[in-house]
A protein has these predicted regions:
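Walker A/P-loop NTP-binding motif
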Residues: 32, 48-61
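Conserved small/polar residues in nucleotide/adenosyl-binding loops
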Residues: 204-205
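SF2 helicase catalytic motif II
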Residues: 133-172
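Conserved SF1/SF2 helicase motif Ia
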Residues: 56-79, 87
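Conserved helicase ATPase motor motifs in RecA-like P-loop NTPase domains
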Residues: 42-43, 148-149, 168-193
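Conserved helix/coil segment N-terminal to the catalytic DExD/H
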Residues: 100-141
Length: 205
């Protein structure tokens, strides 16, 4: 039950709503049911919880790993730190800002199954080390934050984002997945052309 887990992990009695819409709960329920989704969330709208809660649930139930891809290294660290402040130590980030010792410890925590949430930048998917540690884990979902970076129509276009879909396909082939691994895309941009681009290259269609 997602409300039960919401209380256990985050201490909240209910999900937030936006102008009467239960966006948070809808996104969590879709993820828990194993669906891919594209969610348009307002900035500061409680988006993080909608992928963190299902990730923590699957981490505890099936020892799954959720891979969160974000272009903003400082925000990744903030999210990991915020979870740690709540006593949740399941999340790690591996990025270029880490010193060698911290990086090695983060890699070790993913390898030994302590982490159920891994935050990385899209360019890290080209790393053989990252590929190796992901191959050794049961990845249950890829979460793509700031998904408007897929779109050449947006001013935030990132060419590294175009590699994400290729990586997911390659990963599934190497793992011999019978079913596609679910993908969640999050953006604050509702422009139709941008949304079409996200669907086309993010592997959510």
């Amino acid at each position: 039950d997602v409300l039960h887990n919401l209380k256990i992990f985050f201490g909240y009695e209910q999900f937030r709503t936006y102008e009467g819409e239960a966006l948070q709960e809808q996104a969590v329920q879709a993820a828990v049911k194993g669906k891919s989704l594209l969610a348009i969330f307002p900035t500061g709208g409680g988006k993080s919880l909608t992928f963190q809660l299902p990730a923590l649930m699957s981490g505890h139930s099936v020892h799954g790993l959720t891979v969160v891809i974000s272009p903003l290294q400082s925000l990744m660290k903030d999210q990991v730190d915020n979870l740690a402040d709540r006593g949740i130590t399941d999340a790690v980030t591996i990025n270029g800002l880490l010193d060698p010792i911290t990086r090695a410890l983060s890699i070790q925590r993913v390898q030994n199954g302590e982490a159920s949430l891994l935050y990385i930048a899209p360019e890290m998917l080209r790393s053989k080390t990252i590929e190796k540690i992901l191959m050794a884990r049961h990845v249950v979902r890829f979460v793509i934050d700031e998904a408007h970076c897929f779109s050449s129509w947006g001013q935030d276009f990132r060419v590294d984002y175009l590699y994400i879909g290729k990586f997911i396909r390659k990963y599934q082939q190497k793992k011999g997945c019978k079913e596609p691994i679910p993908v969640s895309c999050f953006t604050a941009t509702a422009k139709q052309k941008v949304v079409q681009d996200i669907r086309a290259v993010s592997y959510t269609h």
